[in-house]
C-alpha cells in the first residue's frame, strides 16, 4: 500500500510540474508557410494547432541513384500569438512519418534544424541515420525522430498576448551508397516551454 501511495504521489507531482511548465491557455498559430523542394506551396497542407500540429506532404520523395532528387527539404515558417508574459519556447522533437526502401548498404540521412528569425545564428540541428546493414532489401513504413539536446530558444515574451517571432523548422532527407527510395508523408513537432 505504501508503494502504491508513493507512486501516486510521485505521478501527481510530475503531472503538476508538467502543467506548471507551460503558459496558461494555448497560444494560437496566426501565420504558417513552407518552402523547399519537398514542400512547394501547393504540395503541402497544415492542420491542427500548436498542441497537435501536422504538416502533410504530397510531394516529398527522393531516390538514389538520381542526380537531381537524391535529397529534399521542407522548411516551415511559423508565428503564434497568445503567449503570456515570461515564457520561451523551443522545439524538443520532430517526427516525420514516411516509407523507405533501402538496398543492402544504402543509407538515409535525415536532419532537422530549428532557429528563430530574430536570432538566426542561434540554431539547433539534430541528425539521424537509417542504414541497411543486412543482406536483404528494407521496404517499410518508418517514423524518423530527431531529438534536440541543445535547443534554440525564442526570445522571452513580455506581454499577456505576445508572440515568439518567426520559428523556422527545416527537415532534410538525403540518400547515398546504394539503390534506395524515401517518401515523407507527414511531419509533427513537440514543443518545450520554460520560464524566463
Where are these regions (language model features)?
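Fungal secretory targeting signals
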Residues: 1-22
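Mature extracytoplasmic or otherwise solvent-exposed domains
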Residues: 19-196
Amino acid at each position: 500500500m505504501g508503494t502504491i501511495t508513493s507512486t501516486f504521489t510521485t505521478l501527481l507531482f510530475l503531472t503538476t510540474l508538467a502543467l506548471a511548465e507551460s503558459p496558461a491557455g494555448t497560444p494560437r498559430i496566426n501565420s504558417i508557410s513552407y518552402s523547399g523542394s519537398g514542400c512547394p506551396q501547393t504540395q503541402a497542407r497544415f492542420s491542427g494547432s500548436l498542441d497537435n500540429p501536422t504538416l502533410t506532404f504530397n510531394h516529398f520523395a527522393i531516390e538514389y541513384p538520381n542526380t537531381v532528387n537524391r535529397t529534399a527539404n521542407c522548411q516551415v515558417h511559423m508565428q503564434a500569438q497568445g503567449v503570456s508574459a515570461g515564457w520561451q519556447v523551443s522545439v524538443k522533437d520532430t517526427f516525420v512519418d514516411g516509407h523507405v526502401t533501402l538496398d543492402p548498404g544504402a543509407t538515409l540521412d535525415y536532419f532537422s534544424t530549428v532557429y528563430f528569425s530574430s536570432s538566426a545564428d542561434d540554431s539547433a540541428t539534430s541528425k539521424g541515420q537509417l542504414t541497411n546493414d543486412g543482406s536483404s532489401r528494407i521496404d517499410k513504413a518508418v517514423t524518423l525522430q530527431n531529438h534536440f539536446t541543445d535547443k534554440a530558444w525564442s526570445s522571452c515574451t513580455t506581454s499577456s498576448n505576445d508572440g515568439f517571432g518567426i520559428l523556422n523548422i527545416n527537415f532534410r532527407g538525403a540518400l547515398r551508397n546504394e539503390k534506395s527510395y524515401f517518401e515523407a508523408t507527414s511531419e509533427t513537432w513537440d514543443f518545450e516551454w520554460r520560464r524566463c
